[in-house]
UniProtKB/Swiss-Prot annotation:
Region span, Involved in ssDNA binding: 42-51
Binding site residues for Mg(2+): D49, D51, D100
Domain comment as written in the entry: Small DNA polymerase formed from only a palm and a C-terminal subdomain. The total DNA-binding site of pol X is composed of two DNA-binding subsites.
Organism domain of life: Viruses
Site note Stabilizes dGTP in a syn conformation to overcome the Watson-Crick base pairing constraint, residues: H115
Source organism of the structure: African swine fever virus (isolate Tick/South Africa/Pretoriuskop Pr4/1996) (ASFV)
Disulfide bonds: C81-C86
GO BP annotations, alphabetical order: double-strand break repair via nonhomologous end joining
Protein's recorded name: Repair DNA polymerase X
């Protein structure tokens, strides 16, 4: 367990330290492509872990980011890691914390931010309402009859409004 303040400090420390190895080179992950999600974004007082969403600029890089993740000046161990999710244990100020990393492509960003911020109860209500209209919403997009529905949106707030719901800031979601 860690406090919200500790979680925010960890994220600030990580922002300039995340990179991945690709074709023998170390590629820095830009701070603007690292988004705090989960209980940290909802500003819960106590956190079980730190969740970060990494926006990957090119599809060809997606399979390389998490399996080849590097954190400058941090000691960490990998619990499990794939193309879209990686669970790490990081050493920070003499304690060990769980860090969950997720990836999304730029066009998936609004959907992924909503999905990984949650909370689950909020997402269930939205998805149930959409299901009645034969839509499926997940972290990759909005689908109707298994076909991606293109929406001209770039933010989570625009997504919520486009779906016909009232936007609530993450800490006010139930």
């Amino acid at each position: 367990m860690l406090t919200l303040i500790q979680g925010k400090k960890i994220v600030n420390d990580l922002r300039s330290r995340l990179a991945f190895e690709y074709n023998g080179q170390l590629i820095k992950i830009l701070s603007k492509n690292i988004i705090a999600v989960g209980s940290l974004r909802r500003e819960e007082k106590m956190l079980n872990d730190v969740d970060l969403l990494i926006i990957v600029p090119e599809k060809k890089l997606l399979k390389h980011v998490l399996p080849n993740i590097r954190i400058k000046d941090f000691s960490f161990s990998v619990k499990v890691c794939g193309e879209r999710k990686c669970v790490l244990f990081i050493e920070w100020k003499k304690n060990t914390y769980q860090l969950d990393l997720f990836t999304a492509l730029a066009e998936e960003k609004p959907y992924a931010v909503l999905h990984f911020t949650g909370p689950v109860s909020y997402l269930i209500r939205i998805r149930a309402a959409l299901k009645k209209k034969n839509y499926k919403l997940n972290q990759y997009g909005l689908f109707k009859n298994q076909t991606l529905v293109p929406l001209k949106i770039t933010t989570e707030k625009e997504l919520i409004k486009e779906l016909g719901f009232t936007y609530r800031i993450p800490k006010k979601r139930l």
